[in-house]
């Protein structure tokens, strides 16, 4: 889990736009965040398996 201070810092508008970075809305992870859902790959996988993300299902071929 990310520190609360990191989550607060990520929500603030940066002084320059290029300094902005994505952070998972659920756990605060900064790496591997899916922009469309604003959550990390780990949280995405858990929520997808639970069926809590509409339109997403496990691939099978």
UniProtKB/Swiss-Prot annotation:
PROSITE patterns: RIBOSOMAL_S14. This is Small ribosomal subunit protein uS14. GO terms for molecular function: rRNA binding; structural constituent of ribosome; zinc ion binding. The lineage of its organism: Bacteria, Bacillati, Mycoplasmatota, Mycoplasmoidales, Metamycoplasmataceae. HAMAP family: Ribosomal_uS14_2_B. GO terms for biological process: translation. The keyword S-adenosyl-L-methionine does not apply. The keyword Metal-binding applies. Belongs to the universal ribosomal protein uS14 family. Zinc-binding uS14 subfamily. Binds 1 zinc ion per subunit. Zn(2+) binds at residues 24, 27, 40, 43. Keywords: Metal-binding, Ribonucleoprotein, Ribosomal protein, RNA-binding, rRNA-binding, Zinc. Binds 16S rRNA, required for the assembly of 30S particles and may also be responsible for determining the conformation of the 16S rRNA at the A site. Part of the 30S ribosomal subunit. Contacts proteins S3 and S10. It comes from the Bacteria. Its cofactor is Zn(2+). One of its GO terms (cellular component) is small ribosomal subunit.
